Amino acid sequence: LDELKHLFYFLVSTFTHSHISTLVMAFLVIIIILALIFDFINGFHDAANSIATIVSTKVLTPFQAVLWAAVFNFAAFFISRYVIGEFRIGNTIASSVNKEFITLGVIFSGLIGAIAWNLLTWWFGIPSSSSHTLLGGFMGAALAHAGALSRNGTDVINYAKVIPTFLFIFLAPVIGMVIGFVITITIVNISRKAHPYKADNWFRRLQLISSALFSLGHGGNDAQKVMGIIGAAMIYYEKTKGHDMTFLQFINANMWVPMASFTAIAFGTMSGGWKIVKTMGTRITKVTPLEGVSAETAGAIT
């Protein structure tokens, strides 16, 4: 009788453990799908910013422009992987919240908040940074989970990683404005004696290069942020199984994560985002090909 009892308890515990593991795995899959949906939304939301000037100057049609941007969004994968050699931005996002406070629930909540805000700003045609929204959602969910800024002497937020990122949110527009100003003044002085029609043609061609550089920067930055979120979720899952690893170790062993992230943002870019293109390209200011080259180059550098 005792042996039957032990067998019964063993079967129940095994079934329960297996059932819980299945639920955790299902939750993980949902989070990965949500992260890639966010990446897709990022594509048609933020990539519109990178093609607005090239569309408003009529260098490319909206359809041509989104294809152009999508190609270079995806090409950023090869730059990150084989030229730079690492996914540093993804690592920053994955480690923006200390490991002790990361759970699948935290990541799920952060993603839902970021997706909701992205769709809202897209609906109203408001330019905003999807990737910084994702970072904010992740940190906000972690703070809500912890119920405080720190616990047992450990900060919820990894400030050494996060503070430079948030400082750059405010500094980037100013830096971009200064660089754009300098580029424009320099080009105007160099091409002062050029024939207006000939100069305009040259700037239209140069805008193809500057918009490509901008799209490379967009893909290289924003796709990696989604990689960071997926990486954080996968690392948490592996931790529950007794395997501890860093983000870069995980990514190097699971190249499907960056491939999926860069593919999702590229497909999102191809889906458009015309409302934001109209706002960026015509409602904020009318731009010429010269100004388009300057703005896109400044944005790519920043």
Where in the sequence are the language-model features?
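Alpha-helical transmembrane segments and immediately membrane-proximal extracytoplasmic
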Residues: 3-302
